[in-house]
Amino acid sequence: RYGRSYAMSHMPMSRMGRKMYQNYMYRRMQATKMMQYH
């Protein structure tokens, strides 16, 4: 998806950036799940 390439171009592929990106994707996934439930 476009989100990954966007993050890669805007974030240095360091361990910290990768962790932040994974955390963001995880939170986004949880948000979409909640939206589906409601």
Curated annotation (Swiss-Prot):
One GO MF term on file is: toxin activity
Where is this protein chiefly located?
A: secreted
List keywords of the entry alphabetically: Secreted, Toxin
A GO cellular component annotated for this chain's UniProt record is: extracellular region
Top-level taxon: Eukaryota
- Please give the tissue specificity annotation from the record for this chain: Expressed by the venom duct.
Compartments annotated for it: namely: Secreted
Miscellaneous remark of the record: Turritoxin GpIAa was only sequenced until Lys-33.
Q: Which family does it belong to?
A: Belongs to the turripeptide family.
Name listed for the protein in its UniProt record = Turripeptide GpIAa
Q: Which organism is it from?
A: Cryptogemma periscelida
